[in-house]
Each structure stands twice: as C-alpha cells, then as structure tokens.
Amino acid sequence: MAAPRSCVLWSYCGHGWSRLAGDCRLPGFRRSWLGATLSARSLSQEKRAAETHFGFETVSEKEKGGKVYQVFQSVARKYDLMNDMMSLGIHRAWKDLLIRKMHPLPGTQLLDVAGGTGDIAFRFLSYVQTQHERKQRRQLRTRQNLSWEEIARKYQSKEDPLGGSLVMVCDINREMLKVGKQKALARGHTAGLAWVLGDAEELPFDDDRFDVYTIAFGIRNVTHIDRALQEAHRVLKPGGRFLCLEFSQVNDPLISRLYDLYSFQVIPVIGEVIAGDWKSYQYLVESIRKFPNQEEFKDMIEDAGFQKVTYESLTSGIVAIHSGFKL
C-alpha cells in the first residue's frame, strides 16, 4: 500500500542492514524556479498527470495514499476474519499454493511486502522449518555409524530450526503490523521474523538483498505500481524471484456476472456487519475492478526488468499468481 511520502516514517527492528529513507517529495509534485511563469495550460497538464483512482473515484496521487492508509487502519483488526468471510476461506488455499510455488529451502531470505498481518510470513516459516527438519532426518539416515547418544544430542541441540531462513514483513500501515506482531506472539513465531514499517514504492533495504519478494493482495493499493515493481527488482539478488498473488480478471462470462453480483451486493454488507465499515470494503471491491488483467500486469512486470514472467489464474481467474526472475 502506498501513502503520501510526507506521511512515511521508516522504522526498523531486529537487524542492522537496512537504511532509513531520506526526504521525499510528494508524488507528482514538481518544484520549478520558473514559478509564476508556468502557464495555465501546463498547470492543468501537471494536475491531470498527478491524478489516479481510488476505487472508481478519481483523486490526486497525494490524496490516494492517505485514503488507502485510512482504509487499512480501519479494517486491520477484522482483516483476517473478513478475508475468511469474503472468500469463504478459499484465500487460505491460494496462499498455500503461493508458498508451494515458492518452495523455499532452508536459508531463504524473503521480503513480504504489504504483509502486515503475517499470513504469508507464517506460512513461509512453517514451510522452511518442515524442509529443514526433513533435511536433518535425511542427514541422520546417511550417517549410519552414529550412536543413539549422538543422534539424541543432535535432536536436542539448539541449532536454528529454520536453517538460517529469514522473513522481513514490510508494510506501510502501523495498525496492520501491530496485528501481525500480536499474531506472531500468539503462535510462537519469534525466530527468523522481523517487522519493518516501509513504503513499497521506496523500500528501506539495500540492493540485491533478498532471495524472494512476495506481495499478496497489496499491489493494487499502491499508487505507482511501476515504482513498486522497480523496487522489487532492485532489492532482489541476481537470480531472485518475484511472486505476486492478486485479484485478477475472471475469464468465464457466467462466473463473472455472479462474481460481480457477490462483490458489489454482498461484500460491502459483510463489511458493515462484521467490521462496521461499508465504505472500506466498497473501495476494496472497486480496486479489484481497476487492477490490470493478467496479461497487462505481466507486461508491467516485464517492463520493470523481470524475465521469465509467467502467471497462473486460480478459481476461474478471480485471482492470479504472477512470477518473474531477476536475471
């Protein structure tokens, strides 16, 4: 999610390899010593260039960032419950598939952007821990000459259960991160996990830092999607992988009509009943319809420098997983 640059306050905890963001200008704002000599026509053109959409509403780029921030601040506490209610739980299967496609091995360094409540991060940690345990068992089986005492000591040793894996959860919204941290404590996730307040359009990390970049149901809320994609490319190591799970375009006419009916007539009502917030869920539905289709988004990913870009549509195209590599 993007917000006005003037609202961004970088924060970091857990490791010392990130950098703080410096002063930023507002998106679309241009200083000029010509000042008053700018013509009315050029001012009008600049104003149009700085316009974007907030759902079906046309707003300034500066205004969109603040509006999106307020949406997720409002829904943070009920965000996970609403995901279950709106998707009838299917979002869990989509996220599980994203992790299986990633197939992270022990030692993988993951950046999960717009991942505030931790759904992707927790799945990643569970997956790599399972992979690490399997690796350990294979190693023990190949060392037939170990005594039972040596085997017991190895299992009881306090080595990293994740095999050196790390997931950084980066989100621009403090409330979403707060919910994620509370969930992590409740589930006992402490090792290999850190939380960062940051903007997808200007990530507070060094170049060539991560093995994998994920963003699930977040990139459509970014003001400048192209900038977020360029940042994803920058922070990935050579050979690193970009994975995006996002709502997309339904490819069946009948299902599309039913989906529209459910989206516009049912989801805002659920939002009002469960979260007491009709408008936020009306925006979320509208933002899905404004997002590029599968092929258009694939082109945007390629324009950012990624190669071998592919996508897989799920549930008749309601969502899609896009994948690309930094080569």
Curated annotation (Swiss-Prot):
It catalyses: 2-methoxy-6-(all-trans-decaprenyl)benzene-1,4-diol + S-adenosyl-L-methionine = 5-methoxy-2-methyl-3-(all-trans-decaprenyl)benzene-1,4-diol + S-adenosyl-L-homocysteine + H(+). One of its GO terms (cellular component) is mitochondrial matrix. InterPro entries: SAM-dependent_MTases_sf, UbiE/COQ5_MeTrFase, UbiE/COQ5_MeTrFase_CS. Gene3D superfamilies: Vaccinia Virus protein VP39 (3.40.50.150). It is a peripheral membrane protein. It comes from the Eukaryota. It is found in: Mitochondrion inner membrane. Residues 1-49 form a transit peptide. Keywords: Membrane, Methyltransferase, Mitochondrion, Mitochondrion inner membrane, S-adenosyl-L-methionine, Transferase, Transit peptide, Ubiquinone biosynthesis. S-adenosyl-L-methionine binds at T117, D171, D199, A200. GO terms for molecular function: 2-methoxy-6-polyprenyl-1,4-benzoquinol methyltransferase activity. It holds the Pfam family Ubie_methyltran. Its EC number is 2.1.1.201. Its main location: mitochondrion. One of its GO terms (biological process) is methylation. Pathway: Cofactor biosynthesis; ubiquinone biosynthesis. SUPFAM superfamilies: S-adenosyl-L-methionine-dependent methyltransferases. It is an enzyme of class 2 (transferase). Coiled coil: none annotated. Methyltransferase required for the conversion of 2-decaprenyl-6-methoxy-1,4-benzoquinol (DDMQH2) to 2-decaprenyl-3-methyl-6-methoxy-1,4-benzoquinol (DMQH2). Component of a multi-subunit COQ enzyme complex, composed of at least COQ3, COQ4, COQ5, COQ6, COQ7 and COQ9. Interacts with PYURF; the interaction is direct, stabilizes COQ5 protein and associates PYURF with COQ enzyme complex. Belongs to the class I-like SAM-binding methyltransferase superfamily. MenG/UbiE family. This is 2-methoxy-6-polyprenyl-1,4-benzoquinol methylase, mitochondrial. It comes from Rattus norvegicus (Rat). The lineage of its organism: Eukaryota, Metazoa, Chordata, Craniata, Vertebrata.
